[in-house]
Amino acid sequence: MNVFDFFGSAVCHQMAERSFFWGSCQSPLCARCTAIEGGIVLGVIFLWLAGRKDGNRPFSPSGMVLEALSFLPIAIDGVGSYLGFWQSNNLLRVLTGALAGYGLPGLFLLAANFSPAKENINPVYKNTGEQLILLLVAVAYGLLVWLGILPYFLVALVSAVGVVCFYGCFWFLILLTMTAGKKFPCFPLSLAGGLFTVFVVATIVQRIS
């Protein structure tokens, strides 16, 4: 098991029949998780580059609708295939995963920064167009993986970083809630917490599997 597979085991079942292959190299995550974590990485990069770490203004009505609808396909496909109504495939998995993953960082950021006791004027997204572009980029990433265009190392690296960011989002929410109104290096500590959590969870998974 390489380091990418180790990181992936912290969130994913890693079933071969639901994963991608580059020769003998299996993706560290299943198709759905690959797209989810890819979307998370893209969301984190966007919010960081756009300087939205203080975003606390609720989404616009259309933005909220888009965010809610983005989670609907993964719920329908997951439940429907689990109950045996249809057999899902890797294309459906990457599409539904990308739709769900891109918006998670924004939701965590809003949950961490929003305060009913003050005026929330800093946008997470300036408009719905930003969300839509981010969504389309996440879907494009998933399709490129599905088509086999992207190399193994890039997909594996993005997947591993995405797992760290996923757990890091929880740490960010916790740290910002605990240190509200105080200057505290929440972002780097959140990444460190995410990395630590991945190591602990993956180690436990390896021990019991």
Each language-model region and where it sits:
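Secretory/periplasmic and organellar redox-cofactor proteins
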Residues: M1-Q26, A31-G43, L47-S209
